[in-house]
Amino acid sequence: YNTENGIHYEDMMSAERDACLFFNVARIEEAVKAGKFKTYGNKVPVVDGTHEANKDAATALVAYVSVPKNPHGVNASPDGKYFICAGKLSPTTTTIELTKVLDWFDGKLEKLDDSIVAEVEVGLGPLHTAFDGRGNAYTTLFLDSQIVKWNVDKAIAFHKGDKNAKYVVDRIDVHYQPGHINASQSETKAADGKFLAVGCKFSKDRFLPVGPLHPENEQLIDISGEKMVLLADHPVRGEPHDFIIFKRDIIKTKQVYDLDESPLAIKDAKESGVFRNGKKVTVKLTSQAPAFSMREFTVKKGDEVTLILTNLDK
């Protein structure tokens, strides 16, 4: 957003279209290898990703696909085919086909915006999108306080001119002003379309106040059927943000950490000590409840001190 490079709100929101950016990682890596970058105060290489420097598809590092208006979230479909960009200040979502963007980089697509295969109205204040693996997208509508379920293929058909294509499948009220959203394994090839979680930025009357910070609301929704069903509310900290849902059997748990995985770990309290190299001082110590291997240590004013603490409780 703010492709206008504005400072005031009225300037930042003056353009009807902004941009969704796609980065050509291979070209960026080649540019860095060739020394075509700058540094600003550190050694991190910074390539030129400005719009002016990336208009020629043959050399572009970045593709600027135009989207309306002050776009917010962009999310990839489980098959990796489409990227859905939410309009925020536009009641639309823009569906961009990745292969067409790659065709533009390769000189096979003349107009970059021809990678837009759908741009449809879904509601007021679209922010983020999740997927069920069955071809449906779920977008949060901040101003409408809703989640809208819509079918991507039907949206593409509608965009092409089929006005009989009913792309909106369902809507459900949430409480209130939803932002981040995710479905079970949503942006992976294993999306299973069972559950949806949504972070609502305001709970309003949903929970009793418990102190200076009023709890906001995360809601769990069943998306296994045609209609969405609200299952549960959960009070959460303010401004709930990104989260994922995944199957617990893919987690490989550990009961005890392997100290060999940490090259700086102190494996024995006898290795504790203060080690000086000029003004650089490294302090190594261990802890094992309720004590530390060193209760105190002394350094000089002006020293640069690195403290390495390893817990040896079992």
Model-found features: residue ranges?
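Extracytoplasmic copper-binding redox domains, predominantly the cupredoxin/blue-copper superfamily
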Residues: 263-314
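Predominantly soluble domains enriched in secretory-pathway, periplasmic, or organellar proteins
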Residues: 1-273, 280-282, 304
